[in-house]
Amino acid sequence: MEKEQITQLLEKQRQYFYSGATLNLDFRISALKRLHASIQKHEAQIHAALRKDLGKSNFESYMCETGLVLSEITHMLKHIRSYTKEETVPTPLAQFHSRSFRKPSPYGVVLIMSPWNYPFLLTIEPLVDAIAAGNTAILKPSAYSPATSEVIRLLIHECFDPKYVSVVTG
């Protein structure tokens, strides 16, 4: 992907984030459910790619990569409402007439660059957290695990609009 294409992608994601579409909690939950279903659907392809890139068995691929990601998504779906809830915190004495609170809010566009050794886990697990937080994301899987990078690209393309989540390979 050329520099100009990446710049355009980044701008589209910023525009999408600023539209407020990712702030809706039901939107985030729906995105996480789609990702969970897609991972389950393509689990055999993911394991085959991990075998090709790293020589991992199906058992190791599940225990160290896909199983952990599916578990993270399940955990996030269970707790997302409490993680995104506004929280009252103690007010400093100087502002006694005020109310203090902490409100979790997304950053915007998140870049997730992953290493070669756990290419699926270390790409998708941070994505789960970015989606749950209400961000858009650009994923850059390692060039040293090309088969897994391609499966991730196909999986993300199937689940999400590029203005929401995109994959840059190479």
Q: Where in this protein do the model-derived segments appear?
A:
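N-terminal Rossmann-like NAD(P)+-binding subdomain of aldehyde/semialdehyde dehydrogenases
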Residues: 1-101
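Rossmann-like NAD(P) dinucleotide-binding subdomain of oxidoreductase/dehydrogenase enzymes
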Residues: 93-170
